[in-house]
UniProtKB/Swiss-Prot annotation:
Keywords for the protein's UniProt record, in alphabetical order: Cell membrane, Membrane, Transmembrane, Transmembrane helix, Transport
Species classification: Bacteria, Bacillati, Bacillota, Bacilli, Bacillales
Entry's localization field: Cell membrane
Annotated gene: yybO
Protein name, entry field: Uncharacterized transporter YybO
Transcription regulation recorded as keyword: no
Chain segments annotated as transmembrane: 26-46, 61-81, 96-116, 119-139, 150-170, 177-197, 242-262, 281-301, 325-345, 347-367, 385-405, 407-427
Amino acid sequence: MTEEVFIMSQERVKRPGHTRWYISSLLSGIIILNYFDRVAISVAAPAIQDSFHLTATELGIVFSIYTYSYTLMQLPVGSLLDRFGVAWVTRVGMTIWSFLTILLAFLQGKLLLYLFRFLIGLTSASAFPAASKATALWFPPSERGLANSLFDSAAKFSNVIGAPLVAFLVTTFDWRVAFLTIGCINVLFTIFFWQYYEQPERHKRISKSELNYIQKHNAITTEQIPYKTGPLLKKLFTNRKVWGLMIGFTGYGYTFNLLLTWLPTFFKHTYGMDLMSSGLFTAVPWLISTISGIAVGGWLVDYFIKKGYPNTKVYRTVIIVGMSFGFFFLGSILTNNITVAIICISIGLAGISATAPVGWSISAELAPIGSVSMLSSMVNLANNLFGGIIAASLTGYLFDVTGSFTLSFLVAGFVLLLGLVFYVFVLGDVKRIKL
């Protein structure tokens, strides 16, 4: 166990103030809205497919082209966040993607649909690296598991509230009203974020005692990157632990993104559900995964670390158990019973969701001082390159070829196994990389 964790587990430290938890709620709000767009395109997919006369392969392009641009921006946005800070990079990105979402509601023609999805991906790319960076700045390691789980689980919770909401708006009005509504909500939240977020030492509402508490126990106290981007990337890309983390996280991300984009369509085609029913059934596994991410990947991880257990042992145990449960989602392709299918998907999604906050915690602990956003962006790059782009587009192609989701789910199972192998055998002990 590290000296810092030992001290924090032995001392009865008073934790003054709650501003950092308000910040955590703010970060969760960003992720919910960031994923509302993805949930909307997923739930409204059948209506959009009819409106633009898209094949399943073309619909896969609509899903994946967002991820192409989102992925392309990961390394640039990581550098921008480390150099200019979370506040301004996120403010600018949120403002642009909010108005693009509103304009999306008025589009005509599939080429414009592709273009706007590409642009929204570019401007929303900062969300997860920014949340990871802000959490590392605002929270000491003993609280970081829960803080990471809150913003990570927000991505799942967006499906719980977003899927029924979008399904209602699409069935009551149309898909354009759904995107117009989401865009307006984004604008309002952007104004709130603009006013409230700042890093700890600049925040107007933080008490001196809470600031001292954060700075005393936190190894990450600056947003400024002390290294040139080129040498830093070379060092990180040639580090074995970084590859263990990137591919390990991708094992989670492939199944997550497949279910995020295709689950409503899976229910519709496999069980003949209407849009409203598929939206409601989609919310069930995501609600369970939200609870799992916070309870296991957050609270339970922090509990054992505060008890003095080594970070690496705690992280590895959660990853092995969580990913093992993740394979349960494959049971959904072996049954014709919708209840059994939802149970299998719920268990599998809950399992992998418990591992996601652990991945973000590992990223913060591995990254050289001042470069948390860069490493987080690299993890998100790998996750979205393989888990996002390939999962979304390959699933559409395989469905066109085979007429079912069976092969797509089997591919996801293989990637999940590969991720588990990299986490366990390539990542090794979680220790900060020194340059």
